[in-house]
Curated annotation (Swiss-Prot):
Phylogenetic classification of the source organism: Bacteria, Bacillati, Bacillota, Bacilli, Bacillales
GO cellular component terms attached to this protein's record: cytosol
Pathway membership, UniProt: Metabolic intermediate biosynthesis; chorismate biosynthesis; chorismate from D-erythrose 4-phosphate and phosphoenolpyruvate: step 4/7
Name of the protein: Shikimate dehydrogenase (NADP(+))
Taxonomy, superkingdom: Bacteria
Binding site for NADP(+): G124, A125, G126, G127, A128, N148, R149, T150, M151, S152, R153, I209, G232
Active-site residues per Swiss-Prot or TrEMBL entry: K64
E.C. numbers: 1.1.1.25
Organism listed in the record: Staphylococcus carnosus (strain TM300)
Enzyme superclass (EC): oxidoreductase
Length: 269
């Protein structure tokens, strides 16, 4: 079977080597490639996938919402979220799923067992944030707070969340047990920190869904303050494993996947 990940930019993605490690561990003769598709060329997505005979693919920034009009169906979870990170192509039909939130929460519970009672702030209101918000709403009792620079970004949100501006969030940081950055700030060469951490409580866990670099600027800042930190590696591995199960019905070798990603990250350092 042939799989892929689409995004822009995509050169930093470790999805191909991670999935290849899983294929080899399971003795499968599958392939997985990264496809850089700029927004201006996205209308060609059907032709591109047909030409490459792709059976399923992942979607990353900035296409998680852009893909929706091209789908024939979405599962109930993805419909609630309104963002897609996984597409299965079956008998010519494109079916959309979202495994981001599931993957993130699986890992978060390992580092924050008392997740049910946590007060959580998400930073960013893009497609990735929607996926996490849906899963965190199910996992935690408190109403989730989501902060974004542009409030109009919430106009197409159907999820029950408390919305606030970045400025409001900065002042209220001390009220949260977990703060999660879902924006691209800090990814690869981007050294931005989207929110000041001056009012952060001492024990608040600061997380970032980015895994390249291993410690983003916001995580370094939090660590310097003595706060616990958690990056996006487990989410990356777990969402990939969930996608693989959707495509094939098989359980992925997450140990092989994670070890391969860690090796690649060490080489980049």
């Amino acid at each position: 079977m042939k799989f892929a990940v689409i995004g822009h930019p995509i050169k930093h993605s470790l999805s191909p080597v991670m999935h290849q490690a899983n294929f080899e561990a399971l003795g499968r003769d599958d392939s997985y490639e990264a496809l850089n598709i700029p927004p201006k060329h996205f209308h060609l997505i059907k032709e591109i996938m047909a030409e490459k005979e792709i059976d399923g693919f992942n979607i990353t920034i900035p296409h998680k919402e852009r893909i929706i009009p091209y789908l024939d169906a979405m599962d109930a979870h993805a419909k609630t979220i309104g963002a897609i990170n996984t597409v299965k192509i079956e008998d010519g039909k494109w079916i959309g799923y979202n495994t981001d939130g599931i993957g993130y929460v699986q890992g978060l519970k390992n580092v924050y067992p008392n997740l049910k009672e946590a007060r959580i702030l998400l930073i960013g209101a893009g497609g990735a944030s929607k996926g996490l918000a849906a899963a965190l709403n199910e996992a935690a009792d408190h109403t989730l707070s989501v902060a974004n620079r542009t409030m109009s970004r919430f106009d197409n949100w159907d999820l029950k969340v408390h919305t606030l501006t970045l400025e409001e969030a900065e002042k209220q940081l001390g009220d949260f047990d977990i703060v999660i950055n879902t924006t691209p700030a800090g990814m690869s060469e981007n050294q931005d920190v989207v929110i000041a951490l001056d009012h952060l409580a001492p024990d608040t866990l600061v997380s970032d869904i980015v895994y390249i670099p291993y410690k983003t600027p916001i995580l370094k800042l939090a660590e310097a303050k003595g706060n616990p930190i958690y990056n996006g590696l487990d989410m990356f591995v777990n969402q990939g494993a969930e996608s693989f199960k959707i495509w094939t019905g098989e359980t992925a070798d997450t140990k092989a996947m994670k070890n391969t990603v860690l090796q690649q990250l060490q080489r980049r350092d």
